UniProtKB/Swiss-Prot annotation:
This is 3-phosphoshikimate 1-carboxyvinyltransferase. Monomer. The active site is at D315. It comes from Streptococcus pyogenes serotype M2 (strain MGAS10270). The lineage of its organism: Bacteria, Bacillati, Bacillota, Bacilli, Lactobacillales. Belongs to the EPSP synthase family. It is found in: Cytoplasm. The keyword Transferase applies. 3-phosphoshikimate binds at K23, S24, R28, S169, Q171, D315, K342. PANTHER family: AROM/DEHYDROQUINATE SYNTHASE, PENTAFUNCTIONAL AROM POLYPEPTIDE.
Length: 430
């Protein structure tokens, strides 16, 4: 088996980086553009494999989507403009694509089969199946947990519902709201903790109406959406890898340009500042929720990460775990059981990989206890098909002074950051 040999024993990282477009916003721009009336143009779209799965799904549903002058142009025909697909919709590795598109197709008068790759086929869909069934959709997966493939028969006469989310999940909330846009009457979604709010913001950007009152979102349907011009900011979840690298590699100084800082996504910035990180914000645009972040190597101390903070940094927890291995003292991550049903069981995989490199991490049912600082050594590892695990391991390898780090299945990183290794090499040489 050929494994990728990762760069180790890096000197200070220096330079400026523009991370790819935000994955969450890219998905939603395509989804809402596909059912809005008129021509939607998207600048800065992430061209990773997950977003390409969403684009291909809508092409299969009869929507015309093409690239023109470095923009994605979507010819939306409204909610009535989708056609029954001639084939199965393949969502690849993308849980966002499957869950949000299932919500959207809930109000369509045709049936569809949705499949995914081996990793997606192990991710539970019961969380969207139950609320969509309550709205009148025939939808089912495999076993009680409703694993993909999903079979869905839409319903033009969807019923509005009031639904309290049993878990903190922006994907479930979004699936219900996309269905609610096609249901006659008032749908309410009540969250456990506030999760990323891109769907709510972008529905309004496309001319939709909803009311957000704390953890309660109210939407009266049916509604029509109008095409927009969207500019996608850099993805804070991708910027997180360089943020951490800059903080833990001695002598580093990096400028991360044009990073989206929607407040429902900035948990990682609060955590690293609490741990003692030296970071500064430049060219902050509060209206567009975009800033550049300057980061320099810092001496860090352990912290506790729990409660309402978790949904605001759920995707950044693997790289935060690496950060904690280099901080003085104990870092405790709690209330993060959702990590166990991501692309991998991220609690177990992060613990196993970093411990194999010399870290001191104890996995718990809902998180990790990490003692630092520890020296990291070479190891043979794998992404296990999880892009964020792959990038975490590549940043960890930069700290290794003894031994080699080999990574299997590195192609998983294409999911969200196709130019990751190119950017890494540049920062090591600037």
């Amino acid at each position: 088996m050929k494994r990728m040999k990762l760069r180790t024993n890096a000197g200070p990282l220096q330079g400026t980086i523009q991370v790819p477009g935000d994955k969450s916003i890219s998905h939603r721009a395509v989804i809402l553009g596909a059912v809005a009336k008129g021509e939607t143009r998207v600048k800065g779209l992430l061209k990773g494999e997950d977003v390409l799965s969403t684009i291909q799904a809508f092409r299969n549903l009869g929507v015309r989507i093409e690239e023109k002058d470095d923009q994605l142009v979507i010819e939306g025909q409204g909610f009535q403009g989708l056609n029954a697909p001639c084939q199965t919709l393949n969502m690849g590795n993308s849980g966002t694509s499957m869950r949000l598109i299932a919500g959207l197709l809930a109000g369509q008068p045709f049936s569809v089969k949705m499949i995914g790759d081996e990793s997606l086929s192990k991710r539970p869909m019961d969380r969207i199946v139950y609320p969509l069934k309550q709205m009148g959709v025939e939808i089912s997966g495999e076993t009680d947990r409703q694993f993909p493939p999903l079979q869905l028969q839409g319903n033009r006469n969807l019923q509005p519902i009031t639904y309290t989310l049993p878990i903190s999940s922006a994907q479930v909330k979004s699936a219900i709201l996309l269905a609610a846009l096609q249901a006659k009457g008032t749908t309410q979604v009540v969250e456990k903790e506030i999760t990323r709010n891109h769907t709510e913001e972008m529905i309004q950007q496309f001319g939709g109406r909803l009311i957000v009152d704390g953890k309660r979102i109210t939407l009266v349907g049916p509604q029509q959406l109008t095409a927009q011009e969207i500019t996608v900011p850099g993805d804070i979840s991708s910027a997180a890898f360089w943020l951490v690298a800059g903080l833990i590699i001695p002598g580093s100084e990096l400028l991360l340009k044009n990073v989206g800082v929607n407040p429902t996504r900035t948990g990682i910035l609060e955590v690293v500042e609490k741990m003692g990180a030296q970071i500064a914000y430049e060219d902050m645009n509060k209206k567009e929720q975009v800033t550049s972040i300057r980061v320099v190597y810092s001496h860090l101390k352990g912290t506790i990460i729990s409660g309402g903070l978790i949904p605001r940094l759920i995707d950044e927890l693997p790289i935060i775990a690496l950060l904690a291995t280099q901080a003085q003292g104990t870092t405790c991550i709690k209330d993060a059981q959702e990590l166990r049903v991501k692309e991998t069981d991220r609690i177990q995989v992060v613990t196993d990989i970093l411990n194999s490199m010399g870290a001191n991490i104890k996995a718990t049912a809902d998180g990790m206890i990490i003692k630092g600082p520890t020296v990291l050594y070479g190891a043979n590892t794998s992404t296990y098909g999880d892009h964020r695990i792959g990038m975490m391991t590549a940043i960890a390898a930069l700290l290794v002074k003894q031994g080699q780090v080999h990574l299997d299945k590195e192609e998983a990183i294409m999911t969200s950051y196709p130019t990751f290794f190119k950017d890494l090499e540049r920062l090591c040489h600037d």
